[in-house]
Amino acid sequence: MSPHNFEFHLPLSPEELLKSGGVNQYVVREVLPVKHLSSQLRAFQSAFRAQGPLAILEHFDTVYSILHHFRSIEPGLKEDTLEFLKKVVSRHSQELSSILDDAALSGSDRSAHLNALKMNCYALIRLLESFENMTSQTSLIDLDIGGKGKRARAKATLGFDWEEERQPVLQLLTQLLQLDIRHLWNHSAIEEEFVSLVTGCCYRLLENPTISHQKNRSTKEAIAHLLGVALVRYNHMLSATVKIIQMLQHFEHLPPVLVTAVSLWATDYGMKSIVGEIVREIGQKCPQELSRDTAGAKGFAAFLTELAERIPAVLMANMCILLDHLDGENYMMRNAVLAAIAEMVLQVLNGDQLEESARETRDQFLDILQAHGHDVNSFVRSRVLQLFARIVQQKALPLTRFQAVVALAVGRLADKSVLVCKNAIQLLASFLANNPFSCKLSDIDLAGPLQKEIQKLQEMRAQRRSAAATAALDPEEEWDAMLPELKSTLQQLLKLPQEEGDHQIADAETAEEVKGRIRQLLAKASYKQAIVLTREATSHFQESEPFSHTEPEENSFLNLLGLIFKGPEASTQDSHGDTDPGLTGSKDSPSVPEPEGSQSNDELVKQEMLVQYLQDAYGFSQKITEAIGIISKMMYENTTTVVQEVIEFFVMVFQFGVPQALFGVRRMLPLIWSKEPGVREAVLNAYRQLYLNPKGDSARAKAQTLIHNLSLLLVDASVGTIQCLEEILCEFVQKDEVKPAVIQLLWERATEKVPSSPLERCSSVMLLGMMARGKPEIVGSNLDALVRVGLDEKSPQDYRLAQQVCLAIANISDRRKPSLGERHPPFRLPQEHRLFERLQDMVTKGFAHPDPLWIPFKEVAVTLTYQLAESPDVLCAQMLQGCAKQVLEKLEKNATEADPKETAPRLPTFLLMNLLSLAGDVALQQLVHLEQAVSGELGRRRVLREEQEHRAKEPKEKTASSETTMEEELGLVGGATADDTEAELIRSICEKELLDGNQVLAAFVPLLLKVCNNPGLYSNPELCAAASLALGKFCMISAPFCDSQLRLLFTMLEKSSLPTVRSNLMVATGDLAIRFPNLVDPWTPHLYARLRDPAQQVRKTAGLVMTHLILKDMVKVKGQVSEMAVLLIDPVPQIAALAKNFFNELSHKGNAIYNLLPDIISRLSDPEGGVEEEPFHTIMKQLLSYITKDKQTESLVEKLCQRFRTARTERQYRDLAYCMSQLPLTERGLQKMLDNFECFGDKLLDESVFSAFLSIVGKLRRGAKPEGKAIIDEFEQKLRACHTRGMDGIEEFETGQGGSQRALSAKKPSAVSRLQPLTSVDSDNDFVTPKPRRTKPGRPQTQQRKKSQRKAKVVFLSDESSEDELSAEMTEEETPKRTTPIRRASGRRHRS
């Protein structure tokens, strides 16, 4: 067929070219075999060199055959074909530029070039698509091969790197389309198929997910330019719009790619109308359809969001089309529209020079954003807060909106969604960082200047009014000037009742005369008198104008005053009753001409602006203060990200000088112990930022600031706070983040080289001690200086400083038990060291003086002695003997001076208290010393000895006598080699020797028991507290002694009238439960009983102790754990938070809460001892929130349904129904309810029960699948039928009752009322002293657990009045005979 006699039609599929079509339509004559393709391609290349691009007309079959066999041919042939076709199209493009300008071009030549153009483009584009398809398939096969390996596989398959070849092909097509090729077609109208061929190739390339990768950026740009040319020159807009909408719905990787392209078209190609078309198509999408098509909605949302970031001004013209989606169900579309609005506020509607229409548009957009801060979807609320944070950060939020948006953020802090809370905190932090008011935001500091400037403004206005009067102001203008202050005065007076005082209107006075007086008072600015007179006139002249028909409200009253002041002619004028009466209200009113010119007006305006600024700043600081109170409660949330945001917020608030920020900075301290590394690091960063980088001109100035700031944290700090701060400083010191200048200055203050107060010295020693934990040499190298600073004899003695010196010195050694195999013995000081000499002297001399600070000092002194001294028991025995000697001397002296009639000598109470307290401390520390230091040293030496024997080396030099003495004394030279032997030895010493009659400690036991057994005789609260705590410490030593005194301990725990004693004993018994679990286990119910103690202090302590014991598996978790559940509704927030934390931790221990729930529900809904209905709901809502597993839910549903059969009261029915309504039910849970319907069907007559089950139906419907709705409908129908007609078996019962519902059961005592008085808590008959537990042969009865490291701080003060009591010990008849021993094997226990 001659080239001039055929026409090439672009096919829809390659097969069409093989079929005969219309007249003169080109048809492929032969598909060449693979073996001939190389030679035919060479022939095509030769023809191209001779004929140019038109050679394709005769050799198209060769190219078609290559495309047909593309998968079968060699990679080299593919690459040669591609390179050749690129050359052909490039040559044709160059020639067409001159051919198209030739006016004399013949029809046959035009037709030949048109056919060649279509053939060349078709062949090149089909070849491009073939390469692309093969690359995509190779990528799918090699998904597991990443990086270079994947790319190498593709290169091996194709013979070259295709990704580098795409861009040149696309650029070649772009150059071709940029020519005016329309002239090749008749009527200069390019056929649609040709445009579709080129653009379709682009869209297919975009469908490849890898197109969004950074490495394909050049390809994306080439595609965008090619499509841009098609849009501009070939009327492709409609097709592009439809295609873009389709691709957004199906390809999630395309939104950013298409945004880049559309932005390019709108800016570089001037095709802004394409944006309108696309937005119109999206805007016309049905919201209901998008709620089902989540993939499409996601694509549209991402596209709109990024498009708004790129070209907000272009998109803004079409925003009205999108606003309907704000009411749609799909939250992603709402988020996208809101994000677009925010971008317009940021980039288009920002600045102070906006026109009025633009300002109105901005305000409308901000209104929309604020409204969606309360959206039903948490993701939308969160997004709004994020958008406002960006607006604030870029200072695009008008000042008038600050209060409203801050209030929105504060309100969202209480949101149920963690994400919303987190973003609310971030928004408030953005407000702080970008606030226009001040770098220091303190409402206390701002209140004074605000009042001062308000007073100044009032004076300026008064001067202005007086000047205006002399200038004969128009009454209307004068009225406007006085209106704000007049209205303010009126508002204050209207709040007060009208006083019945002296009448100001005489009987003969007329209404006109009174009007004149009112006018004069207003002119003199005597507003209060004028208002009082007018109020009286309205009641006196009820029939006279203008006082008749005046309502006692603000607007009517102002109208009346205005009418009196301005005259009757003002009655037809508009009322000013709605004018803003604020201090800045006159800014917008007409200016009153001043005799002195405009300077006075300018000053007044400036003053009004200043007052407005201070008012805004004051309001802002108040909102921030309110937010601080809410955010501080979020510091212990379970979500790490929220906690981190809270910490960052308080860092920022602290830097802005808000007074309440210090509370938050202190409150974050315990988070240093968090198990979450992110939280711990956030706390360290916060303190690093706040304290380690202070401002100052020199290193010393910075050190002074740092020490001052840290000292503020120590003011009134608790023991827990100090421990947390110590951990943080230890971390900083170990990382060398604390400068040497800081440590140097601390020593100078401690040793008084620089002037410092006693408190400053004390805080310096405390800080040195904290740092010594990280680097012991800080204190160890200056030990003598520290002893001299705090322990030298003074008058009076500073026990607070001495206590801190002891604590600091204690940090120079490791307090942990020595590890086995340690080469060097633990660090200890000789007995003769001056430290112990001074400690012994201060303890014995201070013993005879009633100084309350001596008690905590002697406790740390004894602890330090046992920690650092060689043979500390000898030193402490000397302390005890010295103090006891003073007591005996005092007794002898009193005996000689006492009245002969007295039967027994008296002793000052504080001496007996100090003696018992010291004895208790020594007893406990002796136990710790034996179990840690002595036991650890025995083990260390044994391991070293075993290593020597194992290596069969020559014996080392004989150890020092000081190291062998202990083994000789204990009889271990023969070589006990087992841990059990050493533990048995230590246990034997504790049980048989420490409290033996010949030992020092044993001498104090009779005295201690006498004080504890006779609370009526020894009634001093401090003495009782000290004695009870000392008894608890003595009981820790020996199992036999503990067993003999448990009855006395629990009697005091139950019946002591002093909350301090009960609290201390709760701690003591908790420690005993860990050390001697088998002995204490039968008494566990009495431990639980303290959870309902009437004293807040005792309940809190009991909650802490039981939390520790239960979570550490030290006591059996029984149904009595319901007492812990009751603490969830405790009126004291700290106790309720403690209980919540307990259940949070318990929920992590397997199925613990699930197993306990049935018993808890039974106990709390028990008519005899349960809680009221509302508290029950609160408790169960919290506990049931921990049930998240489907199997647990189903099992609980079945159990609760069965409980309906045994429930006795309607209250119990309601409780069970409520519990079921709180469970996260599934279809299987619903099936369980249907299977057990007869258990509760007859209870549905109760309205509350019925409502609870209806709420279950509502929850099930929300997440139900279509196939599950039938069973839900069936369940609801059964519920309604039983509610209205009852079960088949109860119709006669309903008839007998006359259709009336059963009466509600009487209400039970509230949770608070369960805190019974001490006299009625657990009668004596409830006490049972268990018998000693029988143990298995070969296993000692008193097998002990390792004692807890924690030790309660002694508290001796009590606000409770003491009562004379008789013996606190129970009689033998009260002693129970039952035992409930626990079988425990310490070796098998899993410790958490």
Curated annotation (Swiss-Prot):
It is found in: Nucleus; Cytoplasm; Chromosome. The modification Phosphothreonine is found at residues 1329, 1375, 1380. InterPro entries: ARM-like (IPR011989), ARM-type_fold (IPR016024), CND1/NCAPD3 (IPR026971), Cnd1_C (IPR032682), Condensin_cplx_su1 (IPR007673), Condensin_cplx_su1_N (IPR024324). Residues 1360-1373 have a biased composition (Acidic residues). It comes from the Eukaryota. It comes from Mus musculus. Phosphorylated by CDK1. Its phosphorylation, as well as that of NCAPH and NCAPG subunits, activates the condensin complex and is required for chromosome condensation. Pfam families: Cnd1, Cnd1_N. Residues 569-602, 945-966, 1293-1392 are annotated as: Disordered. The lineage of its organism: Eukaryota, Metazoa, Chordata, Craniata, Vertebrata. Residues 1344-1353 have a biased composition (Basic residues). Regulatory subunit of the condensin complex, a complex required for conversion of interphase chromatin into mitotic-like condense chromosomes. The condensin complex probably introduces positive supercoils into relaxed DNA in the presence of type I topoisomerases and converts nicked DNA into positive knotted forms in the presence of type II topoisomerases. May target the condensin complex to DNA via its C-terminal domain. May promote the resolution of double-strand DNA catenanes (intertwines) between sister chromatids. The modification Phosphoserine is found at residues 20, 575, 1300, 1305, 1320, 1323, 1358, 1361-1362, 1367, 1386. Residues 1-593 are annotated as: Interaction with SMC2 and SMC4. Keywords: Cell cycle, Cell division, Chromosome, Cytoplasm, DNA condensation, Mitosis, Nucleus, Phosphoprotein. Transmembrane segments: none annotated. This is Condensin complex subunit 1. Belongs to the CND1 (condensin subunit 1) family.
